[in-house]
Design a protein with these regions (language model features):
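Active-site neighborhood of phospho(di)ester-bond hydrolases with catalytic His/Asp-centered motifs
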Residues: 25-28, 46-52, 74-76, 132-135, ...
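Short gly/pro/ser/thr-enriched loop/turn and capping motifs at secondary-structure boundaries
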Residues: 79-83, 159-160
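Active-site metal-binding motif and surrounding structural segment of the metallo-beta-lactamase
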Residues: 34-78
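Short, glycine/acidic-enriched loop or turn micro-motifs at the edges of active sites
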Residues: 29-30, 55, 139, 158
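Metallo-beta-lactamase
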Residues: 83-131, 138-183
Length: 183
């Protein structure tokens, strides 16, 4: 188990991808894919588990699946349609980021439906118990690694990339639901 700093836009300690038992939890943006692949040392992941589909967590997913076409991807059922057809996600992101969208997050590719397994919460996926945790996003899930009791919480709690101790609350537009998040 290790965190892989994908060095977003060349900056360390901004976005991290966890590698757990050969699986990638939140591979990050496509703009950082080359760094992620280098740090994986050419090894094919076993699966991708997404806590949510925001671009800083999931934008590299389609490109990774294009590289390894049989790679399974796990995501909440509300996020799955936007991985399969990212057009609405991209339209929303373009309103927010404008002409910086591709620079910041890379080229977002669709994930074939055959690769996507939807989650609702309560499942166990490859030794990871899934919890539905809306608030930060309506399609947010967390994963509990049952062997080590380690939780992978995406942005539902806060943002911190080891080895730093800095914790930042994640509050992105447009779908933050503070009341659900506080539950």
């Amino acid at each position: 188990m290790r965190v892989i700093d994908v060095e977003h836009l060349g900056r360390p300690h901004v976005i991290g991808c966890w590698e757990v038992d050969g699986m990638l939890v939140d591979p990050g943006p496509e703009s950082s894919l080359q760094t992620l692949l280098e740090k994986l040392g050419g090894e094919r992941p076993e699966a991708i588990l997404l806590t949510h589909i925001h671009l800083d967590h999931a934008a590299a997913t389609g490109a990774i699946v294009a590289r390894w076409p049989d790679l399974p991807v796990y995501v909440h059922e509300r996020g799955a349609p936007h991985l399969i057809d990212p057009s609405r996600l991209l339209a929303s992101a373009e309103r927010l980021y404008g002409d910086k969208l591709e620079y910041l997050w890379g080229k977002i590719r669709p994930v074939p439906e055959a690769n996507v397994t939807t989650l609702s919460g309560g499942e166990v996926v490859r030794g990871m118990r899934v919890a539905y945790t809306p608030g930060h996003a309506s399609h947010h899930v967390c994963y509990l690694h049952e062997d080590t009791d380690t939780a992978f919480v995406g942005d539902v709690a806060a943002c911190r990339i080891p080895p730093t101790d800095l914790v930042i609350p994640p509050t992105p537009p447009p779908d933050i639901d503070v009341e659900l998040w506080e539950e």
